Structure formats: structure tokens, C-alpha cells
Amino acid sequence: MARRLTTDGYRVMLTGLPSYDAEQGLPGGDPAALAAELGAFWHPADLTAPGGPEALVAAAVEHFGALDTLVSCHTYSTHTPLGELDSAEIDRHLTVNVRANMLLVQAYAAAHGEGRPGRIVLFTSGQRLGPMTGELAYAASKAAIEYLTRDFSVLLAPRGVTVNAINPGPNDTGWADPETHAWVRERFPAKRWGTPDDTAKLVSWLCSAEAGWITGQIIDSAGGWSRDNA
């Protein structure tokens, strides 16, 4: 997404939690290096820390002088079937995926100048398209994002700010083992995985002036993927 937005002329700030990003061990998973490559502003942040989301928005405003667009694609997700749920894991999902987004949007709204168009793009998942019985805490947190997207869109529309959420579907970022990769691929009608670039194209469009009349929407960018496909 950062590559696409930079290519399309946006001035971009990237953030991440270095300790967590390093644990994931995914290819291309170093946002600081990516920021340096793209000439973007890199500002690490812990969105679970007190004041973390507010400080992140303040850093963007200080660096750029204003903040027009917020793309919030951070997430926390673990395997949480019914028999393995515990309060700590539920709280972690809600803190990262719900509370942090609420505070980011609140801080954005406070910092966004009157009379300037604005864009907020949040990320959800496919929980409304079929059961996610092995990811109960994650599914609950992403369902909250869909609800909040609609409320935020109503609250911010008078100020010219659109708010939408994307369900990117399964993206081939290196996380899936070979068996999972094959199972998921067969459930895409096109028999290929989605890619980060597929999602990035939609993000960039939603951030553009052309999407000024699109708000309060939950948009599936998932290539028709369904667990029911075979």
C-alpha cells in the first residue's frame, strides 16, 4: 500500500511496532527499511500504549503540517477457537483492533482542518461472509470495525471526510503453509490468491478525489473468495 500511495503522489508516513514486526518474520516485513526506500516518514508506535494513537497522529501533523488521510491496516490475529478463548487474548484483540482504531479516528478528527476533504480507510475481514469459528476473538474485533465505519462516516460526513472499510480477503504475504495455500487458492474463482497490490489499488482509489461520494461502505476486495467455493 505504501508503494502504491507513494507512486500515486501521496506523502506517506509509515508506522509499526518493530518488536512485533520482527517476530512475524515475513518477507518484506521491515517497514523502516521500506520507508527509507520510498522516501516516506517512518515513525514507530505502540498503539496499545496509553496515548499511543494520539501521539502517532500528532507526529504526522508535526511532520507534514496537516493530515488528510488515515489508512489503518494494523491488526492482531491468533487462533482462538471456543475451547481456547481466554480473557487476555480477547482483550488483546479488542485493544489492538478496536480501541486503537477508535482512538486513531478520534485523534484524526481533532487534527483534521475544517474545509479540507479527508479520507479514512479501515480494514475488516470476511466474518460476515461465513463462519470464522477458529478466530472468534479476531472475528468479533473486525465486526466492531464494520459497525464503527458506518458510525464514523455519519459523524464525519459534514466535514467532508469519507470513512470506508476494506475486506482484502486472503492475501499472499507468505504466512500460509503449502497445504493452507493450496486450500485457499482453490476457493478463489480465478484460482489465484489476492495480492497486496490488489488491495493497494482500492486503497489508493478510496483516498482519491474520485471517491468523494463513497462513504460508510464495507468493500470486499477478495476476488470472489469464499470458504464455500471448491
Residue ranges and their predicted role:
Residues 1-64, 77-80:
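Short-chain dehydrogenase/reductase
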Residues 105, 141, 149:
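Active-site helix of classical SDR
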Residues 110, 154-155, 212:
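Alpha-helical segment proximal to the catalytic Tyr-Lys
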Residues 157, 162, 214-216:
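Short, small/polar-rich loop/turn modules that mediate ligand/substrate recognition or access, typified
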